[in-house]
């Protein structure tokens, strides 16, 4: 749950019928082990498939969703993959990072410290650090994309692409609740305008409101 600036993870201790931790240890970090699917997860993961690495069962949701750790990706320490989020390639989440609501980390992207990733895509060598929040917009449903070697310590929300060597500081907030795509690449800023915004549509008729009667009062 996320609210009031405080993130609280609620993890069920019910029997895990989604995955199991194998004895296949990570070559560099032997305290990490691969997971194996116990059932089909979406259309891509079949029962028996090996996944990425975790430190404990608490790193990956055991709920009936499609969250999964692929390839050589890692979820370690108190980090948590939840609500259809996925890790690919050599992505890493660690510390108390929380990745949820269909978010995807690929290549060598990293979420660390207390980063909160909701619905966003991180690729390349992108980093989410500190108390950063990378969030989909509740208004448009669109989510940020982080790529290159960018680092985010602050808040990014909506259809925002952070690329190159861009750094978003902890006190900075970049929010886009429009249909356009906002692009930040180093010191450069640009916009990809949504084509639908250049079209005019007839105004929808509105129900006329009845005027209050004048009960003997002067106008």
Predicted regions and their residues:
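Terminal amphipathic alpha-helical/low-complexity segments used for targeting or macromolecular assembly
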Residues: 3-66, 72, 90, 96, ...
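Extracellular beta-strand solenoid repeats
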Residues: 68-70, 74-76, 80-82, 86-88, ...
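Short, flexible helix/strand-to-coil boundary loops that buttress conserved ligand/catalytic motifs
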Residues: 138
């Amino acid at each position: 749950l996320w609210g009031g600036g405080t993130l609280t993870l609620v993890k069920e201790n019910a029997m895990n019928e989604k995955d199991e931790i194998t004895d296949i240890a990570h070559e560099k970090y032997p305290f990490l082990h691969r997971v194996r699917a116990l059932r089909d997860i979406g259309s891509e993961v079949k029962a028996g498939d090996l996944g990425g690495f975790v430190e404990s069962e608490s790193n990956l949701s055991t709920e009936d969703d499609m969250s999964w750790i692929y390839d050589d990706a890692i979820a370690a320490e108190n980090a948590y993959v939840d609500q259809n989020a996925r890790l690919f390639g050599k992505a890493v989440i660690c510390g108390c990072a929380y990745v949820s609501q269909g978010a995807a980390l690929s290549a060598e992207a990293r979420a660390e410290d207390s980063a909160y990733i909701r619905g966003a895509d991180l690729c390349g060598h992108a980093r989410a650090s500190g108390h950063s929040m990378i969030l989909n917009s509740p208004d448009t449903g669109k989510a940020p994309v982080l790529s290159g070697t960018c680092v985010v310590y602050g808040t990014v929300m909506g259809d925002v692409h952070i690329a190159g060597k861009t750094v978003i500081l902890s006190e900075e907030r970049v929010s886009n609740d429009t249909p356009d795509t906002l692009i930040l690449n180093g010191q450069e800023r640009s916009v990809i305008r949504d084509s639908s915004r250049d079209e005019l549509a007839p105004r929808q008729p509105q129900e006329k409101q009845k005027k209050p009667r004048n009960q003997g009062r002067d106008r």
